[in-house]
Amino acid sequence: MSQALGAYRNGLRAARVAFKGDLRMLMAARQQMRESMVNPPNPELPPDQQIKLMNDVAQFLRQNVVQGKRTKDDKYHLNIHKDTELGDNETIKTTKKTLAAQGGGCCGGGAGLYK
């Protein structure tokens, strides 16, 4: 039971970091976590896997959710914090053969583009 409580608290702390300054989203995330603890979405999972799922959600919130706020000049200020995962985008630069248009794309003009 203490592991479940620890995972729940971990989720609440992660939501506080991810949704800092956005009270509406913070309250919605807290309500969703509370509901998921009382009525698990996958009740057939063993408790240890449900605890792992809650910890994974907390990790995802900390590392991958970034709040943005529109500024006066139609730009966005992102709330990037110390736990935000910043990738180097190297995987984006490499083209995957499965995603390349084999037949030349929808209009036929891309034949030989990704070779």
From Swiss-Prot:
Subcellular location field: Mitochondrion matrix
Taxonomy, superkingdom: Eukaryota
Transit peptide, residues from-to: 1-35
GO biological process per UniProt: mitochondrial respiratory chain complex III assembly
Entry-linked InterPro entries: Complex1_LYR_LYRM7, MZM1/LYRM7
Keywords attached to this entry: Chaperone, Mitochondrion, Transit peptide
Any single Gene Ontology cellular-component annotation: mitochondrial matrix
Major place of residence: mitochondrion
GO molecular function annotations of the record: protein folding chaperone
Quaternary structure and partners: Interacts with RIP1.
Family affiliation: Belongs to the complex I LYR family. MZM1 subfamily.
Purpose of the protein: Assembly factor required for Rieske Fe-S protein RIP1 incorporation into the cytochrome b-c1 (CIII) complex. Functions as a chaperone, binding to this subunit within the mitochondrial matrix and stabilizing it prior to its translocation and insertion into the late CIII dimeric intermediate within the mitochondrial inner membrane. Modulates the mitochondrial matrix zinc pool.
Protein name: Mitochondrial zinc maintenance protein 1, mitochondrial
Originating species: Kluyveromyces lactis (strain ATCC 8585 / CBS 2359 / DSM 70799 / NBRC 1267 / NRRL Y-1140 / WM37)
